[in-house]
């Protein structure tokens, strides 16, 4: 907020460690929210256009992180092979979807929880890992086995196999308030106007009054476009065999977009209904 004093040391650390931009803004101006929304739109190639609808009177600053990813499949799906097929939603209903189709060699593994296929992008620096639950389990039952140790083990088990992959086109636009999740994970004081301690940031009595993430993921024959914006608001008191293996994604599944050299996860989600 224009005129609100933040310690230079806090600004310097954010510029140095996160290449953060710092901008003063008149929060009382009716166009202030438009400035913030425009920045988010520019950073996400217009995938996410509105993250702020109004600025409360007690808001003092917004800490906003934006992530944009566009990956072209190393082996693209041919649009001529896309057919209308059924996808069974988690509630048992069936929905006609545009089902993409290709037969190619991909990394593959199978265990008691999932059949797993890894579809690389471009030069293979990034990939999408598809997790299709075992036929005798629901997606949530299989996801209960997704621990850090199992994730590492499953990735190590991946090896090249010829797969016939059927994958629906899908687009996800989703936003979620994160405060309850952070509190459940043990981060409580930061959201309490009487207990929060941001004294290394400012002399004002600050607390986090807003923590919200906006996500956009679009998967089609060409590849994947994905973006995420996390908004934190600081308020003042008064986060192969010869026969191809069938990998048909025709029921609820999970996906992970990762950077391969480090294993860093950029996006992850689950699709339960199309």
Name what the model sees in each region:
Residues 133-159:
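Internal alpha/beta scaffold segment
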């Amino acid at each position: 907020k224009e005129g609100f004093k933040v310690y230079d040391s806090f600004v310097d650390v954010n510029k140095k460690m996160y290449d953060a931009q710092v901008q003063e803004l008149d929060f009382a101006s009716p166009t202030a929210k438009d400035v913030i929304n425009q920045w988010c739109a520019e950073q996400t190639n217009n995938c996410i256009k509105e993250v702020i609808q109004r600025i409360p009177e007690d808001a003092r600053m917004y800490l906003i992180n934006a992530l944009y990813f566009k990956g072209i499949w190393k082996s693209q799906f041919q649009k001529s092979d896309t057919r209308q097929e059924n996808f069974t939603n988690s509630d048992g209903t069936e929905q006609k979807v545009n089902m993409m189709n290709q037969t190619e060699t991909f990394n593959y593994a199978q265990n008691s929880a999932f059949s797993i296929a890894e579809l690389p992008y471009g030069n293979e620096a990034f990939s999408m890992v598809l997790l299709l639950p075992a036929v005798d389990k629901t997606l949530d039952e299989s996801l209960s086995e997704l621990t850090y140790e199992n994730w590492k083990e499953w990735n190590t088990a991946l090896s090249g196999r010829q797969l016939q992959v059927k994958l629906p086109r899908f687009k996800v636009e989703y936003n979620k308030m994160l405060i309850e999740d952070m509190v459940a994970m043990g981060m409580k004081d930061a959201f309490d106007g009487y207990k929060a301690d941001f004294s290394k940031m400012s002399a004002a009595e600050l607390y986090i009054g807003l923590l919200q993430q906006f996500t956009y993921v679009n998967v089609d024959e060409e590849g994947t476009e994905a973006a995420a914006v996390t908004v934190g608001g600081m308020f003042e008191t008064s986060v192969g065999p010869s026969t191809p293996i069938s990998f048909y994604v025709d029921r609820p599944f999970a996906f992970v977009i990762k950077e391969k050299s480090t294993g860093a996860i950029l996006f992850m989600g689950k699709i339960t209904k199309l």
